[in-house]
């Protein structure tokens, strides 16, 4: 069963949290997808973004949909990013001019249909952090293709993530304050997060985890 989905901007700590849940809770992690066809499409996309953007995003959406179905048939599954996260990047592509409005409508029609027939996780975790925090973590892990991206791109991405989250979240939600909480380096923060996850899986509504406190957030 798909227990948990972890969302957040690039550098928020999604993959790190999934790895922690695998190690500490015995969950099965589902990570970013890659295969030969995806690599071939990406290569063409970087050579001609406007030509290959829709092809790339539809292929990734299809792969994510299959991944969600597979996760739902797996005991204690946790996913690194969801179709909502994919939509964030598609909206960015449209904003940057690589996806035409009519192409976006095509993508959105597929997205809506697949979302409606996809299982809802028991808990959605959204790691919310500032651009400053995300950039510090991006620089720390040292991926050249991320470091060379202009700050304005990451600012837009954070904004799109916040907007998409407010639009699509439903069910049980845990928002982790990624600026205050460091569950990677700080053991007490990690314990705090794991305890909050255990509690929120069985709690209804939206909850926010700040440093030292878990509070209920009214919609």
Model-derived features: where do they sit?
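P-loop (Walker A) phosphate-binding loop of NTP-binding proteins
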Residues: 9
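Post-Walker A alpha-helix
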Residues: 17-18
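A basic- and aromatic-enriched beta-loop-alpha substructure that forms the phosphate/nucleotide-
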Residues: 64-102, 125
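NTP-dependent small-molecule kinase module
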Residues: 136-149, 153-219
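A glycine- and Lys/Arg-enriched "phosphate-lid" helix/loop adjacent to the NTP-binding pocket
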Residues: 89-160
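Conserved lysine of the Walker
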Residues: 14
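Conserved substrate/cofactor phosphate-moiety recognition/catalytic segment
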Residues: 23-63
